[in-house]
């Protein structure tokens, strides 16, 4: 595996981790935030 390919895969993995972390946080917040919307 070349260095550039390793860096590319690492950046993809990091991006996926960040996106999943944000998504999980939003889901938790939306579940806990029981604001009455008219």
From Swiss-Prot:
Which positions make up the signal peptide?
A: none
Q: Pfam families in the record, alphabetically? A: PsbX (PF06596)
The record's Gene Ontology cellular component field reads: chloroplast thylakoid membrane; photosystem II
UniProt cross-references to Gene3D superfamilies, sorted A to Z: Single helix bin (1.20.5.510)
* Record flagged with keyword Thylakoid: yes
Q: Where in the cell?
A: Plastid, Chloroplast thylakoid membrane
Topology relative to the lipid bilayer, per the entry, is: Single-pass membrane protein
Biological process, per Gene Ontology: photosynthesis
Q: Keyword Membrane: yes or no?
A: yes
Alphabetical keyword list: Chloroplast, Membrane, Photosynthesis, Photosystem II, Plastid, Thylakoid, Transmembrane, Transmembrane helix
Segments crossing the lipid bilayer: 9-29
What family, per the record?
Belongs to the PsbX family. Type 1 subfamily.
Quaternary structure (record): PSII is composed of 1 copy each of membrane proteins PsbA, PsbB, PsbC, PsbD, PsbE, PsbF, PsbH, PsbI, PsbJ, PsbK, PsbL, PsbM, PsbT, PsbX, PsbY, PsbZ, Psb30/Ycf12, at least 3 peripheral proteins of the oxygen-evolving complex and a large number of cofactors. It forms dimeric complexes.
- State what this protein does: Involved in the binding and/or turnover of quinones at the Q(B) site of photosystem II (PSII). PSII is a light-driven water plastoquinone oxidoreductase, using light energy to abstract electrons from H(2)O, generating a proton gradient subsequently used for ATP formation.
Protein name from the UniProt record: Photosystem II reaction center protein X
């Amino acid at each position: 595996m070349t260095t550039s390919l390793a860096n590319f895969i690492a950046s993809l993995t990091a991006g996926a981790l960040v996106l999943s972390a944000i998504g999980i946080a939003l889901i938790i917040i939306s579940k806990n935030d029981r604001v009455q919307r008219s």
